[in-house]
Regions:
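Flexible coil/turn and secondary-structure edge motifs
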Residues: 2-258
Length: 258
């Protein structure tokens, strides 16, 4: 089934995805517990955020109008992008690839699980409106299950792994401390497997992958796995939810190299 789904996603056509949904629904599998969107629940906020690490200073990155960038991987990038596009303070969320080389950053190669890439989303945000720690809270509670190794929902493979690609030492510290905090509190039944890795390059995905959750709300996959995540963001974090998504549109996604 994963092979069929991956092939349909490669076509990225809503009619193909609808066909898969119809076929799988007919067998009683598509909306079964094993294939439903990951369960979301409130978790403790990070005890340490960027502000605590920079206490007593006024770094330029937190000045009014400043921007920061972070990269998140947590399963299919359609849903990850969709949630962050509905998060207040996010300026742009771009689907793409991280963890491998530029020459293999193509969907047909990434899906072979031989490139080292993870489907990822580059999030540019205003730290005066939303902090990195608050984005992590959404990531760990709404976007995916961080205890699943190399899979989310029906998608299996290392390119669907849970990973945080940090752009500076502060992000690394906040991410590692938060994971340790959640593990110590036994928030999940199993230990978190999220990788915390330096960002060596982010490569935007093909145009047909951008804004996918918004452009294809009738897709069987989006209905089953991604719209529930956006709904959970609205319910669980109403102060962070934005009804109008911040779409990539015709803007050119930029290549990030720390």
């Amino acid at each position: 089934m994963n092979t069929v789904h991956r092939t349909l996603r490669r076509w990225a056509g809503k009619d193909f995805v609808w066909l898969a949904a119809a076929l799988l629904t007919g067998t009683g599998l598509y909306f079964s517990g094993a294939l439903a969107a990951e369960t979301a629940f409130k978790i403790p906020p990070p005890a340490v955020d960027i502000a605590e690490l920079t206490a007593g200073t006024t770094p330029a990155t937190t000045a009014p109008g400043s921007q920061q960038t972070a990269v998140f991987a947590g399963g299919c990038f359609w849903g990850v992008q969709g949630v962050f596009q509905h998060t207040r303070g996010v300026i742009q969320a771009v689907s793409g690839y991280a963890g491998g080389k530029q020459e293999t950053a193509r969907y047909d190669q990434v899906t072979t699980d031989t490139t080292g890439h993870a489907e990822s989303v580059q999030v540019t945000f205003d730290p005066a409106q939303v902090s990195y720690g608050q984005l992590l809270e959404v990531y760990f509670s709404v976007i995916h299950d961080p205890t699943q190794l190399n899979r989310q929902g029906p998608d299996v493979g290392t390119h669907y792994r849970s990973a945080l690609f940090y752009t500076d030492a502060a992000q690394r510290q906040v991410a590692e401390k938060y994971i340790a905090q959640l593990d110590a509190a036994k928030v999940y039944r199993k230990k978190i497997v999220t990788q915390v890795t330096p960002l060596e390059g982010f490569f935007p995905a093909e145009a047909y992958h951008q804004d996918y959750a918004t452009l294809h709300p009738e897709s069987g996959y989006i209905i089953a796995f991604d719209l529930p995540k956006i709904a959970n963001l609205k319910t669980m974090y109403p102060d962070r939810y934005r009804a109008e998504p911040q779409l990539v549109g015709r803007q050119s996604a930029r290549l990030v190299k720390p």
